[in-house]
């Protein structure tokens, strides 16, 4: 029953055969399909390259003709035009300034001329002459003979002036009195004495030196302006001790060299003297 149904159905089972035959026919008529497609692809690529080259040429031409293009002779020409334009503008401005100055000068000249015309010219007045009376000739007094009475009066005149001598003596006495008072006042005024505080290091010969005797020798030095202070024994090493003693001296009377000379005179006990500290008071 199924086969009978298929026998009555209208189905084209051989259609693929006809399609293959038609394809082969057209292939033979138009040539191979692969070669044709390759040619079309090559032509399209060439056309695209040509179009791209045209676009690039147009863009380059448009860029060179634009205002921002400064490379090449075209750019130099545009820069030159800009500079010329700026120079022309500056020239016009300078011309305007010059014209303003000329107008101001002309106004000043007109003002001066008007002032000169309005003010009258002063007339030169001659100075008034003073009438001077003629000088009279003065006759010298006639010398008269001196009488004996006048000669006696001239002899009685004290030419040296005893009054002036008394005044000079009084002035000298006052001057001496003032000098004496000034000297007394200056003597009563206390004078500042420059003093210094010195710390001395007195070193013995060895550890067997009697340090008490050494200190006694040092303190036995008595000078004007020298005052001895506190002292102590400072260990040096190997059982040896040095005498460290303080003193105050007046700078004008006692010096460090004098102190060293006086202390080093005790050769049996003293080896050397050093200044450990020196301060102004």
UniProtKB/Swiss-Prot annotation:
Cellular component GO terms, alphabetical: cytoplasm; eukaryotic translation elongation factor 1 complex; glutamatergic synapse; nucleus; synapse
Start-end of Acidic residues biased regions: 149-169
Gene Ontology terms for molecular function: DNA binding; translation elongation factor activity
Record-listed Phosphothreonine modification sites: 129, 147
CDD domains named among the record's database cross-references: EF1B
Chain residue ranges for the region called Catalytic (GEF): 173-281
Superkingdom, natural source: Eukaryota
Record PROSITE patterns: EF1BD_1 (PS00824), EF1BD_2 (PS00825)
Residues carrying N6-acetyllysine: 17, 107, 117
Record keyword Transcription regulation present: yes
Modified residues (Phosphoserine): 37, 44, 60, 86, 106, 119, 133, 162
Keywords, sorted A to Z: Acetylation, DNA-binding, Elongation factor, Nucleus, Phosphoprotein, Protein biosynthesis, Transcription, Transcription regulation
Gene3D superfamilies: 3.30.70.60
Compositional bias (Polar residues): 115-132
SMART domains, per the entry: EF-1_beta_acid, EF1_GNE
N6-succinyllysine modification, residue list: 117
Modified residues (N-acetylalanine): 2
Chain residue ranges for the region called Disordered: 113-172
Residue ranges of the region described as Leucine-zipper: 80-115
Pfam families attached to this UniProt entry: EF-1_beta_acid (PF10587), EF1_GNE (PF00736)
Subunit structure: EF-1 is composed of 4 subunits: alpha, beta, delta isoform 1, and gamma. Isoform 3 interacts with HSF1 and NFE2L2.
The family this protein is said to belong to: Belongs to the EF-1-beta/EF-1-delta family.
Name of this protein: Elongation factor 1-delta
Species whose genome carries this gene: Mus musculus (Mouse)
Lineage, uppermost ranks: Eukaryota, Metazoa, Chordata, Craniata, Vertebrata
Gene it is expressed from: Eef1d
């Amino acid at each position: 029953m199924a086969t009978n149904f298929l026998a009555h159905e209208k189905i084209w089972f051989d259609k693929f055969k006809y399609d293959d035959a038609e394809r082969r026919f057209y292939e033979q008529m138009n040539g191979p399909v692969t070669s044709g497609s390759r040619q079309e692809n090559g032509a399209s690529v060439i056309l695209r390259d040509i179009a791209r080259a045209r676009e690039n040429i147009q863009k380059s031409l448009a860029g060179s003709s634009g205002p921002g293009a400064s490379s090449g002779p075209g750019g130099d020409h545009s820069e030159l035009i800009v500079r010329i334009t700026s120079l022309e503008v500056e020239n016009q401005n300078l011309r305007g300034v010059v014209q303003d100055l000329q107008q101001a000068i002309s106004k000043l000249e007109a003002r001066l001329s008007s002032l000169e015309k309005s003010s009258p010219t002063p007339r030169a007045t001659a100075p008034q002459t003073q009438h001077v009376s003629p000088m009279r000739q003065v006759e010298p007094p006639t010398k008269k003979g001196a009488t004996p009475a006048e000669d006696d009066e001239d002899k009685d005149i004290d030419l040296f002036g005893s009054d002036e001598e008394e005044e000079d003596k009084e002035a000298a006495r006052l001057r001496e009195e003032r000098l004496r008072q000034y000297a007394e006042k200056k003597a009563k005024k206390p004078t500042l004495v420059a003093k210094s505080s010195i710390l001395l290091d007195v070193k013995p010969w060895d550890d067997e030196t009697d340090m008490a005797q050494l200190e006694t020798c040092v303190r036995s030095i008595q000078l004007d302006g020298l005052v001895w202070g506190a002292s102590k024994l400072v260990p040096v090493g190997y059982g040896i001790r040095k005498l460290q003693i303080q003193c105050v001296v007046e700078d004008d009377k006692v010096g460090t060299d004098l102190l060293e000379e006086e202390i080093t005179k005790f050769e049996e006990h003293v080896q050397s003297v050093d200044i450990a500290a020196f301060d102004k008071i």
